[in-house]
Amino acid sequence: MDEEYEVIVLGTGLKECILSGLLSVDGVKVLHMDRNDYYGGESTSLNLNQLWKKFRGEEKAPEHLGASRDYNVDMMPKFMMGNGKLVRTLIHTDVTKYLSFKAVDGSYVFVKGKVQKVPATPMEALKSSLMGIFEKRRAGKFFSFVQEYDEKDPKTHDGMDLTRVTTKELIAKYGLDGNTIDFIGHAVALHTNDQHLDQPAFDTVMRMKLYAESLARFQGTSPYIYPLYGLGELPQAFARLSAVYGGTYMLNKPECKVEFDEGGKVIGVTSEGETAKCKKIVCDPSYLPNKVRKIGRVARAIAIMSHPIPNTNDSHSVQVIIPQKQLARKSDMYVFCCSYSHNVAPKGKFIAFVSTDAETDNPQTELKPGTDLLGPVDEIFFDMYDRYEPVNEPELDNCFISTSYDATTHFETTVADVLNMYTLITGKQLDLSVDLSAASAAEE
Amino acid sequence: MSDDDERGEEYLFKIVIIGDSAVGKSNLLTRYARNEFNPNSKATIGVEFQTQSMLIDGKEVKAQIWDTAGQERFRAVTSAYYRGAVGALVVYDITRSSTFENVGRWLDELNTHSDTTVAKMLIGNKCDLESIRAVSVEEGKSLAESEGLFFMETSALDSTNVKTAFEMVIREIYSNISRKQLNSDSYKEELTVNRVSLVKNENEGTKTFSCCSR
């Protein structure tokens, strides 16, 4: 370990592993360490015994739940947008060859006290039971405008400059009612709160297009895909990419103390009495607690069940978004479910998650509207965890710290953080647009 | 990749090679796949997996053989590496007894992460170095017997037994899978529903047993 590296990466969460992979491919000499004896950090997937140890403090789970290794329970439940940034990163790096994916069965929204399918195209809007007959036609027109909208073609702009017009003004033009605005903003554009209504509509329109294009891509019934064996496979796949390009991997390294010179610049990392020298550090917030600040808290529930979520057409994988307003909250609540058909549980078992930005200290009560949708559960765990963001200046200390994973339901913000860090570290932009053609070529 | 009924079907098996650093895992693989040997190869860099085909019962059987990419050096092989592996070669160096003593730990790791492995072989590599041998053939044999593994000594340097060892594992997988297949089709069908491909699949119509044979 007493060697010199250009970059030492601490923590094997998804963000750190993508960066490690990209840097190694660039020819950078990387050492990647984790204090845990498993990959994935906060974004790992746990087997049943690991899950019991974390939440119940016991080493062994009850036998009736099946074999421990048949479980891969995501600690950071999210789905991947079929046409999103993570998919493009996977294709760009060719990491797809280590992974298998399945389309997610269903995308639902909780509106007016009911779980209902999310319509995302003019056709679907007309069939949806979410809206009355006149509202459907208005929504259909709005979806058509979004589908046609092309940034570069003023003819499709309908006389509006979307970088100036707010989302509220755009929606007013189509005369949509409150519930429609709610499901479009939260379940299609996937905003986590209502701030977008007062911001330029461009972002919301692009998000709606991403949703619709992702939906069209695999001709599935949702815009999402999900890797077999759980999300914990993603960091491991990028770690393999890094290793194939010469990255050195060490797990189970206690302490991992970052060392600085008198000027405050990083010089290396010490673990078990040995110091590896480096020019730069890339890490998650837990490795440099003095250089981050708390920005929020997430409340979550993890349930093991023997049935799919009721009212979701028996979907083996599904997302249900509960917009804040439907519960008179400040932030949305998210319900996920996946099952044995994704190799994350033994045959017949389902894993469901409910999560939200915490507004109280009692996750059990706060998450009840979400857990009520699950029906009977075999086991359920509640907990809360803090979220952090860096406050250091990387140009002064050469430390590049990722932001904790947010409560969004997909990986768009995760990859945006990674791309931003990549630019800070290397001074280069990672161009993912070139892969668009490759991505669409894969449409079948 | 779902058209299982197509005629002229192919088989694709995932096989992993495990064992301590510098026992010759990569050289075994390149000797088998490309008939090459690099005496100066340091820790593995740039090796992914190699795909080799052989004919069994008139059917083309492909083996996708994975190398550890050097992650075994500090015992950081990913659990994903073992996913869906149907065959495994556990390699030690006959001139270094520590690599033989660690075989048990590698088997534990394999069993923790994979329940799909139907053919396992213990390999004592570098048998061309008879003069500095530290592990006897009998010791290798008896460990293999007690753990239920095939056993062979090989030399990636002079090619001894390399092809034989890989082909024995592939044949064993094939005969196991063909038998198992009769009973498992319905469950497998269920598991392949909604499968999506992010890239054009070169092996369209290929049966992948890497993740469907659970």
Swiss-Prot record, chain A:
Query: Which UniProt keyword terms apply here?
Result: GTPase activation
Among the GO biological process terms of this entry, one is:
protein transport
What's an example GO cellular component term for this entry? apoplast
Alphabetically, the GO molecular function entries are:
GTPase activator activity; Rab GDP-dissociation inhibitor activity
**InterPro entries per the record?**
FAD/NAD-bd_sf, GDP_dissociation_inhibitor, RabGDI
User: Does this UniProt record's set of keywords contain Zinc-finger?
Assistant: no
Superkingdom in the source lineage:
Eukaryota
What is this protein's tissue specificity according to the annotation?
A: Expressed in roots and floral buds.
**Pfam families, per database record:** GDI
| Biological role | Regulates the GDP/GTP exchange reaction of most RAB proteins by inhibiting the dissociation of GDP from them, and the subsequent binding of GTP.
Q: Which family does it belong to?
A: Belongs to the Rab GDI family.
User: What is the recorded name of this protein?
Assistant: Guanosine nucleotide diphosphate dissociation inhibitor 2
Swiss-Prot record, chain B:
- By its UniProt entry, which SUPFAM superfamilies does this protein fall under? P-loop containing nucleoside triphosphate hydrolases
Per the UniProt record, one Pfam family is Ras
Q: Does the keyword Cytoplasm apply?
A: no
Q: What does the UniProt induction comment state? A: By abscisic acid (ABA), phosphate (Pi) deprivation, cold, sucrose, mannose, and water stress.
Where is GTP bound in this sequence?
A: 19-26, 67-71, 125-128, 155-156
What keywords appear on the UniProt entry? Answer: Cell membrane, Golgi apparatus, GTP-binding, Lipoprotein, Membrane, Nucleotide-binding, Prenylation
Per UniProt, what is the membrane topology?
Lipid-anchor
Q: What subcellular locations does the record give?
A: Golgi apparatus membrane; Golgi apparatus, trans-Golgi network membrane; Cell membrane
Lipid-conjugated positions (S-geranylgeranyl cysteine): 211-212
Residue numbers of motif Effector region? 41-49
Spell out the GO cellular component terms annotated for this protein, sorted alphabetically and separated by semicolons: Golgi membrane; Golgi stack; Golgi-associated vesicle; plasma membrane; trans-Golgi network
| Cell wall biogenesis/degradation among keywords | no
Identify the Gene3D superfamilies for this entry: P-loop containing nucleotide triphosphate hydrolases (3.40.50.300)
- Identify the PANTHER family for this entry: DRAB11-RELATED
What function does the entry list?
Intracellular vesicle trafficking and protein transport. Binds GTP and GDP and possesses intrinsic GTPase activity.
Its name, as the record gives it, is Ras-related protein RABA5c
- Which organism is the protein's source? Arabidopsis thaliana
